[in-house]
């Protein structure tokens, strides 16, 4: 089955400009929002501007919800659940878009700062599935928070402004890399060697005796800078969450500017149109939901991951504010729901054709991707979407002229992966993975097609309105 290139729907002129305009809005978003906290904060800000009320405030007011009401629940500043209350009884199920807003990266350890041969470094622990060798010799930035004992929080964002310093992980020069070049790719760069070089000037002292007795003078100088500029000391790293991410803005990619290269397309290229689709929903038939979660890259665990009870609890609170609470009603609302697990898919790469089966893989320019199943080694660990549900989605997308394609994650036994789909499916929901195709997935700089992003937006809007 030959799928038409989605660009052909948008000839030069206003329609094509709409594609580029939405892509530019997204490019700016991922250029500034590089952590789950930053994404959640920006989405929350936009939601409030769009008339979404905070769920906790509605609970405190013992408010009564009605069709058309817009609600946002905030999960520790690392995830959100947005609801637009529908005309129909919520027991009939919700239309849910579920994406994650964390991305592969490196995190600073809790005791990160040390000195070696008069060079100051920060020790890191990588997060998610990464090719460690891809993270060396790159300009890197620090994003995150430092929470102090007095209750104040210092926001960290260093390396993005032109005048900011950047940081990096060094690599061995080719002239001395004979042994290194013989290693497997997984061992070329060891995880414990992903340490950031952050300084080399010793702390100043007018006392020569003090200079000789002072240990780790370069480290001391870095601590002086941190104290002067941020008001933090070394122990404050114990209660910090600082993420190491590629420095710099996302960029248009290609002579025709048809693509975007940026950090964190997985999964913000699905989270952004999911959120944008929610803003277009006013008074749906079924309650519409946009779920933006953390920790997907490490198994969706923890209080901010999909495996927590945050979403289920939020649904229970919504039903209570509708004046109809019962445990059975919560269970029915979840069981009867329909979900697009908005996560990325691997795009066919002409440089590496052998890992894909060409009839069942995703291509740039062919629109929104549906993955009936993911998993590995005989679909192990996958959510396998029902044929009846896929047929319904085909009709919706065709009725709304949404370009879409179907895909698997590589050839049989080639590898595999997973998403949050199976977790939501545990409630008995109809769930399928549906997102944007990505090149260089999990690399510091990933690539997507602008037209696929635009088709995702329209597909998500159609789903919320019609599913």
Where are the language model's segments positioned?
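N-terminal hydrophobic/helix-forming segments and targeting peptides
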Residues: 1-467
């Amino acid at each position: 089955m030959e799928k038409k290139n989605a660009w052909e729907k948008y000839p030069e002129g206003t329609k094509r400009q709409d594609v580029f305009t939405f892509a530019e809005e997204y490019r700016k978003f991922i250029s500034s929002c590089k952590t789950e906290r930053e994404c959640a904060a920006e989405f929350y800000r936009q939601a409030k501007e769009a008339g979404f009320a905070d769920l906790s405030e509605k609970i405190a007011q013992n408010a009564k919800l009605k069709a058309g009401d817009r609600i946002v629940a905030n999960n520790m500043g690392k995830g959100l659940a947005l609801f637009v209350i529908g005309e129909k009884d919520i027991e009939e199920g919700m239309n849910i878009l579920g994406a994650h807003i964390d991305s592969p990266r490196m995190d600073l350890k809790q005791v990160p700062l040390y000195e070696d041969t008069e060079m100051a470094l920060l020790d890191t622990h990588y997060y998610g599935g990464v090719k460690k060798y891809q993270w060396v010799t790159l300009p890197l930035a620090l994003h995150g928070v430092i929470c102090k004992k007095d209750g104040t929080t210092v926001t960290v964002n260093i390396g993005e402004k032109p005048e900011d310093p950047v940081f990096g992980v060094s690599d061995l020069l080719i002239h001395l890399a004979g042994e290194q070049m013989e290693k497997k790719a997984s061992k070329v760069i060891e995880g414990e060697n992903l340490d950031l070089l952050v300084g080399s000037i010793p702390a100043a002292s007018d006392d020569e005796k003090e200079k000789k007795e002072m240990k780790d003078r370069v480290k001391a100088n870095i601590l002086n800078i941190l104290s002067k500029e941020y008001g933090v000391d070394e122990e404050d790293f114990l209660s910090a969450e600082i993420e190491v991410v590629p420095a710099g803005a996302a960029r248009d990619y290609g002579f025709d500017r048809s693509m975007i290269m940026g950090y964190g397309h997985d999964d913000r290229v699905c989270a952004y149109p999911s959120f944008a689709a929610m803003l277009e929903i006013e008074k749906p038939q079924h309650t519409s939901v946009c779920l933006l979660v953390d920790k997907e890259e490490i198994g969706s665990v923890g209080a901010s991951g999909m495996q927590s009870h945050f979403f289920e609890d939020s649904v229970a609170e919504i039903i209570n504010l509708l004046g109809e609470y019962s445990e059975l009603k919560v269970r029915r609302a979840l069981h009867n729901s329909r979900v697009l697990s908005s996560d990325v898919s691997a795009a066919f790469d002409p440089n590496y054709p052998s890992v894909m089966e060409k009839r069942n893989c995703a291509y740039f320019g062919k629109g929104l991707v549906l993955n009936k199943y993911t998993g590995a080694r005989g679909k192990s660990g996958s959510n396998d979407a029902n044929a009846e549900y896929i047929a319904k989605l085909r009709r919706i997308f065709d009725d709304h002229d949404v370009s879409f394609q179907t895909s698997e994650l590589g050839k049989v036994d080639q590898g595999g992966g997973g998403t949050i789909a199976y977790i939501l499916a545990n409630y008995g929901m109809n769930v399928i993975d549906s997102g944007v195709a990505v090149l260089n997935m999990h690399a510091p700089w990933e690539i997507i097609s602008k037209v696929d992003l635009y088709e995702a937006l329209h597909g998500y809007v159609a789903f919320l309105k019609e599913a």
